[in-house]
Amino acid sequence: MHLLIEALLDGDQARSIAEAKRLGAAGAAVEQIVVDGIGKAVEQLDGKCTIEQFNLLEIMLVGRAVMGVVKELFPQGEPGVIIRGTVIVCSLEGDVHDLGKSILKMVLTAKGYRVIDCGRDCPLDKLLETAGQQQADAVCISGLITTVIPQVKRVRELAQERGLEHIKILAGGAALKQATAENLKVDFVADTAFDGARYLESALS
């Protein structure tokens, strides 16, 4: 498994996929590859993401390698095992940035969550309709521009109107992490994707 972890942390997608295939052919279960391979690699990346060591390019390359392996393991596009919970991710209407959302999707997928991506520029109705249809446990909203803040503040109210009071609401991104959870009317404001993943691990356990 250490060879897969090494390939992932090197950001080498082709080598990562080849190693995942080799492990599968040798009898490793998909769950083991995700938990002991992808999961451990993401944990190590998390540990490096201090202010001094933060490297956005490295995260993007690792993310690309991780998602390549995930697609190899789940060719139908959705994990059939080790689902720890269903999470909806999006950038709200008016925000066309999706880097932060993509990193969060990578981290959560690596940790065994079923992640539904509503994309960028996503209307609130689409977000909550998807959350209801997919029986989501949480929604994660990424915001890079301040104009989405009024929309974020409405998510809780609209979720309650749809009978989705149980859903955890997370916010993150440059425009949102300056605010408090109370101000945004959400459960948690994440400084980083890893921070958000740690909160979900605790909240949904």
Spans of features found by a protein language model:
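Long amphipathic alpha-helical segments
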Residues: 1-81
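Short glycine-enriched loops at secondary-structure junctions
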Residues: 39, 92-95, 121, 175
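Alpha-helix N-cap/loop-to-helix initiation residues
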Residues: 55, 96-97, 148
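Solvent-exposed alpha-helices and their adjacent loops that cap or buttress functional pockets
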Residues: 79-82, 161-163
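Glycine-rich active-site/cofactor-binding loop and its immediate structural neighborhood
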Residues: 82-118
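Cofactor-cradling patches in redox/metallo enzymes
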Residues: 104-111, 116-186, 199
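Short acidic-hydrophobic, aromatic-tinged amphipathic segments that line or gate anion-handling sites
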Residues: 187-192
